């Protein structure tokens, strides 16, 4: 990093490869495939784990480290979760979220084959259209899941998995935020061009709406987004524009 800093450039990879080995602890902790899937569902779909405060200190027992009920505490002491409040733990940052999503994809046998995605991202370099990236995500990524999984999914899973996919190819061009706090609420997904790149001053704000199968028929009759959803995401974009007036902010 010193060499990169002195040269005035940004490294292609900012994630320490040693961090990837942390995911092996989930394999060791959970012991079985079913337990591992349940743990990952809680983190990447529900976005949290419940825990007992006493287990962090007064009742902590290293002999329970591999007990199913003790998983949240074990992950916390491994630095793989952080405390949200006195009841819930969450993932600490986007880097760890990406690591968990990568393992989730492995467990569910979701292909990461570059052939599925690279042509779309190459076109994005040329035309800067976000819509094909979303279409590619739905067809090539979500399209690999069996139908019964979709009723378990939610907006949190959509924004996390979309972030993981987009950041694979555009992390040298953009910084990313999930549930970005602003003066009018929390935007689902935002990508902001990095200064010094061709993407500087480019900002995209995305709001996801997930509907389960029983609501799909009603939603498929719509020819355009609902008015209240458009107003919502435009307010997020306006807030970003106030903070970064030199950026070209687009909302979706």
What kind of region is each of these model predictions?
Residues 3-229:
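Extended alpha-helical interface modules used as scaffolds for assembling large macromolecular complexes
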């Amino acid at each position: 990093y010193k060499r990169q800093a002195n040269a005035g450039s940004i490294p292609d990879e900012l994630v320490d490869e040693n961090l990837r080995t942390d995911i092996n602890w989930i394999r060791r902790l959970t012991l079985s495939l079913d337990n591992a899937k349940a743990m990952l569902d809680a983190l990447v779909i529900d976005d949290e784990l419940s825990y007992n405060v006493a287990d962090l200190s007064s009742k902590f027992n290293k002999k329970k480290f591999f007990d199913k009920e003790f998983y949240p505490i074990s992950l916390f002491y491994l630095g793989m979760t952080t405390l949200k409040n006195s009841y819930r733990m969450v993932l600490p940052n986007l880097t760890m979220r990406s690591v968990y999503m990568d393992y989730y994809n492995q467990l569910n046998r979701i292909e990461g084959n570059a052939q599925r995605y690279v042509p779309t991202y190459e076109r994005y370099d040329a035309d800067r259209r976000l819509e094909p990236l979303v279409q590619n995500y739905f067809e090539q990524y979500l399209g690999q899941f069996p139908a019964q999984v979709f009723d378990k999914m939610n907006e949190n899973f959509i924004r996390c998995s979309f972030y993981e996919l987009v950041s694979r190819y555009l992390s040298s061009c953009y910084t990313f935020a999930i549930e970005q706090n602003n003066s009018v609420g929390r935007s689902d997904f935002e990508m902001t061009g990095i200064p010094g790149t061709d993407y500087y001053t480019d900002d995209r704000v995305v709001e996801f709406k997930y509907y389960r199968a029983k609501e799909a028929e009603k939603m498929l009759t719509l020819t355009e987004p609902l008015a209240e959803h458009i107003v919502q995401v435009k307010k997020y974009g306006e807030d970003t524009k106030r903070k970064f007036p030199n950026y070209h902010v687009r909302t979706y």
